[in-house]
């Protein structure tokens, strides 16, 4: 299903020779052209399927320190019809410029804001895009350098579910955002300019769900194969929700398992010490552990499907060893050739 683009605009934030940032505001929205729709559709798909996103909400002064409420106030005024989209986007551009000026690592970029509808929800997509140089061949076979937006490597982006925000202002997850790379805080300024604070620990919720599923199947009378099928059903449901950009709902998941003959998961999950929310965003890297075991350390990397544990892969925790029966053919060939060489 395609998105329905309502408004979109791009502003430029650049640095002059003295290192001062300035924001050049576009005076009117982007034309609703095929190029604009294609770009936003690509960004929507890329963003929706991107793993490891964080989730939060607008901060509140006092509760969340000195929260920056200017972005939320401008967005509220825009949604009420008292402020035009161009004017709202201009306020956002100036707020981002002010936030970027506090740091010495940024040279700016192109601020994209777009309001669009997908399925039954309205969204505001906000991203700081970078330009990238590339080479092209002209008609006379000469090379020419041009510049284009780097849509394949978006690192600074957030999406506000406007429908959820206005229907449930107390929600802690109506803003999603791309997390910064491990150990880096570069993306923090992007959340600060919007006044966003993290509200849901997505990885922790997904880990708790995995623990609940493992305990549930472990306490059941299911066979080994049936237990693995249950894990895979949970994985399939959760990844489908991730791909759709929707939250995992414990009640729906329990119904999925009940259809497979595994009743009472909802009561089990809510009755334990799992501290699971009724619904929360999925995290594919964490959920993948339902189907696969993998680990790296000391120069050794090992990965195998969960169904092989106890059969092709034997783990002995006492001796701290793993025995693999039926070595993969390509690995066996490499090992045999190395032994012959020695």
UniProtKB/Swiss-Prot annotation:
Its main location: cytoplasm. Pfam families: NA37. InterPro entries: Nucleoid_associated_NdpA. It is found in: Cytoplasm, Nucleoid. One of its GO terms (molecular function) is single-stranded RNA binding. One of its GO terms (cellular component) is cytoplasm. HAMAP family: NdpA (MF_00730). This is Nucleoid-associated protein Spea_1765. It comes from Shewanella pealeana (strain ATCC 700345 / ANG-SQ1).
